[in-house]
Design a protein with these regions (language model features):
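C-terminal capping/gating helix-and-loop segments adjacent to ligand/active sites or protein-protein/ligand interfaces
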Residues: 41-42, 298, 340-343, 354, ...
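Conserved N-terminal structural module of periplasmic/extracytoplasmic solute-binding proteins
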Residues: 6-8, 21-93, 153, 292, ...
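A structural signal for short loop-to-beta-strand junctions that line the ligand-binding cleft
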Residues: 83, 110-146, 174, 289-297, ...
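Extracytoplasmic/periplasmic solute-binding protein
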Residues: 128, 161-215
């Protein structure tokens, strides 16, 4: 019996060892699952995934550049996608991604989402991208002021008209409107129209028709009815700029915080929590005339999906689906965001509790589907012009007809106008080559002797911003516009080029040490661009993108974007062979 027992134990031990070896080999055979989620807390997601699925190796790719939306859109267009894809904007009515992304509709983790949020991203029943955290835009109101006068929150525009009379009689201002940016004007117009025709199925079809040149505003009666409704808002007093400095959002909020204004049209939610006031505030929807189509406006900050290329590798697809399962939960999505961000946003899940957020009072309304998506994609070529015209209208410098005329006038630009092409890349220009080109560009612009351009990459422990001072990403084979250049440009849209005086020895040491952006000791490499051999004891004027605090910088005063446009426009076409 003892012999049998020992033999059984020995066999069990051998099997256990064998099983252990198989598991280790299996683990080692799991290819990394790549994810690119710019400016999110990916370290925490990696830790959470590893805790739940130790066999999965989640590899974070990095992008910390100045134009996230354009870069992610270019990746999508080129089908150069990580396994887990991210986009900042997505409209299934406009964006067809069925040939590049997996339909997730049949997977059980989609059941975690509120039905109304799935309807927002449904592509004829298919689901290619799932929403992450989102913000909600409505009309801020002063709860304390309403309670003080015994007034009820209006549930329709008709109610609002009655309340306006009471407010006027009591000496209370009805509304203040923020007008610092032209985008506000465009959104006010769309948000109000969403409570009428624009927010209906037919209205959504009209949007497609406008964007393709098949319909305009002035020839569409129901859209003209929307414009008439906007006029009613103005006549009632809902469009009122602050008198001290109309273009300052801060001044408008200060005026609102004095406590004698009922409503605020603007971009900021959560007013009152840190603004030094005892008044309490809430958020109400944009109101339809009879209250049957009131809407909050939703702006999803990130969408996530899976690359269709995963279908060629069953093991990777299996692992990627597990990551998506984690990401499609309150715990997983919460890991990606800071606490303050979570408090100011909503999550799209059935089991998410909104009580500790600014939206606690209205979460049920939002989940019930009383919402409309933020209108932006496709409208970029009229957004600023129409927005400005709306702001003029708010200030009595234009009429509602002027707004209509602007939309009709801009339609050709919306349908046909393309941004200026600066050069055309005939192949992918790698990140390192982009850094060399930027270095050469900035050297020429500042008449410098050399350039140190740091490279972005993901380093665990360096936070969600990683290296914003360097070159992030690459250029794809396409026509290159200002937006594309901005996506790789360390100085972004408006920043100026910085230089520093360094000896050849110091330059060599910096190349060895790298750029410590996060102060963790985990550094980003520099690409050194130079025209001549650098002598150790000689001092040089050096362009630097990614400078430690110990360096004394000199501001050239030259805007990096201007220099880059001049530099890249010299190339009719651009390839790796042009990189020196």
């Amino acid at each position: 019996m003892k012999l049998r027992k020992l033999l059984s134990l020995s066999i069990a031990a051998i099997l256990l060892c064998f099983t252990g070896c198989v598991n280790k080999n299996t683990l080692s055979k799991h290819e990394p699952i790549t994810i690119l989620a710019p400016y999110l807390e990916c370290d925490r997601l990696v830790d959470l995934v590893h805790k739940k699925y130790p066999e999965i190796n989640l590899k974070v790719l990095s992008y910390s550049g100045a134009n996230t939306t354009t870069y992610l859109q270019n990746m999508l267009a080129a089908d150069d996608l990580p396994d887990i894809c991210t986009q900042t904007i997505y409209d299934p009515n406009i964006d067809d991604v069925s040939d590049r992304m997996i339909d997730l509709a049949g997977y059980d983790f989609t059941d975690n989402y509120v039905e109304s949020r799935l309807q927002d991203i449904s592509d004829d029943g298919a689901i290619y991208m799932l929403p992450s955290a989102y913000s909600c835009i409505g009309i801020t109101y002063n709860k304390t002021l309403l309670e003080k006068h015994g007034w009820k929150l209006p549930k329709s525009f008709h109610d609002l008209e009655k309340l306006a009379k009471k407010a006027k009689k009591a000496g209370v201002q009805l509304c203040l409107t923020q007008i610092e940016y032209p985008g506000y004007g465009f959104q006010y117009m769309c948000n109000i129209a969403d409570t009428a025709f624009l927010g209906t199925f037919q209205g959504k079809q009209w949007q497609k028709d406008y964007l393709t040149g098949k319909a305009n505003v002035s020839d569409t009666k129901k859209m003209m009815d929307c414009m008439d409704y906007i006029q009613k808002w103005k006549d009632l007093g809902m469009f009122t700029a602050n008198k001290k400095n109309p273009q300052s959002d801060d001044e408008t909020i200060k005026e609102f915080m004095k406590g004698n204004t009922l409503f605020l049209l603007g971009s900021k939610n959560g007013i009152g929590e840190t603004d030094g006031t005892k008044d309490k505030f809430g958020l109400m929807p944009y109101l339809s005339e009879d209250g049957s189509q009131n809407v909050y406006i939703l702006n999803v900050t990130r969408f996530h999906g899976l690359s269709k290329k995963l279908e060629k590798d069953p093991q990777k697809l299996k692992d990627a689906l597990k990551v998506m399962k984690v990401n499609s939960s309150v715990e997983g999505t919460s890991a990606l965001y800071e606490e303050a961000t979570l408090k100011a946003n909503l999550l799209p899940f059935k089991d998410w509790n909104a009580d500790n957020t600014y939206y606690g009072d209205i979460a049920d309304e939002i989940n019930a589907g009383n919402t409309a998506p933020l209108i932006y994609v496709g409208w970029e070529n009229t957004l600023v012009n129409t927005g400005y015209r709306m702001l003029e209208y708010i200030q009595d410098k234009a009429t509602i007809k002027d707004v209509v005329d602007q939309l009709d006038k801009d339609q050709d630009r919306v349908v046909n106008n393309k941004p200026e092409v600066i050069t055309t890349t005939t192949e992918v220009i790698s990140q390192k080559s982009c850094a060399k080109l930027i270095g050469r560009c900035f050297m020429e612009a500042t008449k410098s002797d050399a350039a140190l351009i740091s490279l972005g990459k993901w380093i665990k422990g360096n936070g969600k911003e990683q290296n914003m001072a360097g070159v992030n990403g690459k250029l794809y084979a396409q026509d290159i516009t200002e937006s594309d250049i901005c996506s790789i440009l360390p100085t972004g849209w408006y920043d100026t080029i910085q230089t520093v005086q360094l000896s050849g020895r110091e330059i060599k040491q910096l190349c060895k040490d790298g750029y410590d952006a996060a102060g963790t000791g985990n550094t980003y490499p520099y690409v050194l661009v130079k025209d001549k051999k650098l002598e150790a004891d000689q001092t040089y004027k050096v362009v630097i993108c990614g400078a430690g605090k110990e360096l004394t910088l000199n501001d050239s005063g030259i805007v990096g974007m201007n220099a880059a446009k001049d530099f890249f426009s010299k190339f009719k076409t651009l390839s790796e062979a042009d990189v020196k």
